[in-house]
């Protein structure tokens, strides 16, 4: 009986395939920026700040893990992945742009190394928090909801290739921005523009998701006691 249903199962549709690719690809570009380019930007703009980089790594990993668990639980309880993808992507994009704008802290609080470090770590941590909300808790669960025996191989294969493609494209395109748009007056201009463009695209993806993306029809709210009981 299960095989008959699987054989009769229709595909996920052109729109969902498009969203799967576009949302997933834009998310991987944003992660490449956070994982690869933020530290380079920090070194270029403020010099070798190993303590700040270490703090960024620890706080980002903590925020990502907590966000995935928190919003994953919330998503199950409200029965919606769309809201997480939409609002998470918009906020993710905003804080990706904001990280580049920390460059202008040099003129205002440059001598206060502690304040600069805290601001940079906070911007990166918040960006990672909303990135995990949109991608880990929202997007990953959204496409998992559409998977069954008839399409799990296709969807899984596409999702698995996106990090590889995103890393390659993000590294190459990022290098073009960073090296090609730097000026003598502002050597960090390429970083700022790259972060702004990528953040803007992520915001647009969130807006598009609001209008185009739909949760799986089988998705229903699941509540098991209180929120923190279900969270644990």
Go through each PLM region and give its residues.
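C-terminal membrane-cytosol helix-exit motif in multi-pass small-molecule transporters
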Residues: 199-219
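A membrane-interface helix-boundary motif in multi-pass transporters
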Residues: 81-82, 111-113, 176-200
């Amino acid at each position: 009986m299960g095989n008959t249903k699987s054989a009769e199962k229709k595909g996920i549709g052109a729109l969902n395939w498009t969203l799967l690719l576009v949302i997933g690809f834009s998310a991987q570009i944003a992660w490449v920026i956070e994982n690869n380019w933020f530290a380079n930007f920090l070194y270029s703009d403020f010099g070798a700040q190993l303590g700040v980089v270490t703090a960024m790594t620890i706080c980002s990993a903590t925020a990502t893990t907590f966000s995935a668990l928190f919003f994953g639980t919330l998503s199950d309880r409200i029965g919606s992945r769309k809201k997480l993808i939409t609002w998470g992507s918009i906020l993710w994009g905003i804080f990706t742009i904001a990280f580049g704008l920390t460059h202008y802290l040099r003129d205002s609080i440059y001598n206060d190394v502690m304040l600069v470090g805290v601001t940079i770590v906070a911007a990166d941590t918040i960006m990672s928090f909303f990135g995990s909300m949109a991608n880990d808790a929202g997007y990953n669960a959204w496409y998992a909801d559409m998977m069954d025996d008839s399409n799990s191989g296709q969807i899984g294969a596409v999702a698995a290739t996106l990090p590889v493609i995103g890393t390659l494209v993000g590294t190459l395109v990022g290098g073009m921005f960073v090296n090609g748009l730097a000026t003598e007056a502002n050597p960090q201009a390429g970083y700022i523009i790259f972060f702004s463009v990528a953040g803007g695209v992520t915001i647009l993806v969130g807006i598009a998701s609001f209008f185009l993306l739909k949760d799986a029809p089988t998705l229903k709210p699941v509540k098991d006691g209180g929120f923190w009981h279900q969270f644990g």
